[in-house]
From Swiss-Prot:
Function according to Swiss-Prot or TrEMBL: Essential for the assembly of the photosystem I (PSI) complex. May act as a chaperone-like factor to guide the assembly of the PSI subunits.
Family matches, as Pfam families: TPR_1
InterPro entries: PSI_Ycf3_assembly (IPR022818), TPR-like_helical_dom_sf (IPR011990), TPR_rpt (IPR019734)
One cellular component (GO) term of this entry: chloroplast thylakoid membrane
Family designation: Belongs to the Ycf3 family.
HAMAP family: Ycf3
GO BP of this protein: photosynthesis
Cited SMART domains: TPR
Naturally occurring in which organism (per UniProt): Pleurastrum terricola (Filamentous green alga)
Keywords on record: Chloroplast, Membrane, Photosynthesis, Plastid, Repeat, Thylakoid, TPR repeat
Protein name: Photosystem I assembly protein Ycf3
Primary gene name: ycf3
Length: 167
C-alpha cells in the first residue's frame, strides 16, 4: 500500500497537506518540487522507522536539490538515520556536511556532541581516561555552540557543562 494511503499520523498528514499546497502555490521549478517530494517521503518513512526507504528518498532528494540550506536538512536527516543504526562515524560525516551548508543548525551540533559524549563514556569503560577527557571536551565545544544558537534548548547539556566545569 502506498505510504500516502497508510499514513494515519495526524501531524504527518497535516504536514503533507500543507506541503502539497505550498508546492502548488509557490513559484518553484519541477526539479525543486521533485526534490521536496522525495524529502517529504523520506521524512515520512523515517518517522515510521523504515530507514532503508527513507535513505533512498533522501539520496534522490539530494541528487535533485541544489539549495545548500535545503541540502543541509537532507544531510542532517541522513545523519539521524545512521545515528539510530549505531553507525556513529557515518552519522558524524553527514552532520558535518549539514553544518558546512548551514552552520546555524543547533540540532546537528547537539547530535555531534551526543556522539562524542557517548564515545567519552565508552573510553572510560575501557580505562582510557585521557581519550575520554578529549572526547568530553569535544562534546562540550559542540554543546556550547548549540546552546549559543538555541539558548533555551539542551537543558541537560547545559547542566552537564556546569557539573563538569566545562561551561
Amino acid at each position: 500500500m502506498p505510504r500516502s494511503q497508510r499514513n494515519d499520523n495526524f501531524i504527518d498528514k497535516t504536514f503533507t497537506v500543507i506541503a502539497d499546497i505550498l508546492l502548488k502555490v509557490l513559484p518553484t521549478s519541477n526539479r525543486e518540487k521533485q526534490a521536496f517530494t522525495y524529502y517529504r517521503e523520506g521524512m515520512s518513512a523515517q518517522s515510521e522507522g523504515e530507514y532503508a526507504e527513507a535513505l533512498q528518498n533522501y539520496y534522490e532528494a539530494m541528487r535533485l536539490e541544489v539549495d545548500a540550506y535545503d541540502r543541509s536538512y537532507i544531510f542532517y536527516n541522513i545523519g539521524l538515520i545512521h545515528t539510530s543504526n549505531g553507525e556513529h562515524a557515518r552519522a558524524l560525516e553527514y552532520y558535518y556536511q549539514a553544518l558546512e551548508r548551514n552552520p546555524s543548525l543547533p540540532q546537528a551540533l547537539n547530535n555531534i556532541a551526543v556522539i562524542y559524549h557517548y564515545r567519552g563514556e565508552q573510553a572510560i569503560e575501557n580505562g582510557q581516561a585521557e581519550i575520554s577527557k578529549m572526547l568530553f571536551d569535544k562534546a562540550a565545544d559542540y554543546w556550547k555552540e548549540a546552546i549559543r544558537l538555541a539558548p533555551t534548548n539542551y537543558i541537560e547539556a547545559q547542566n552537564w557543562l556546569k557539573m563538569t566545569a566545562r561551561e
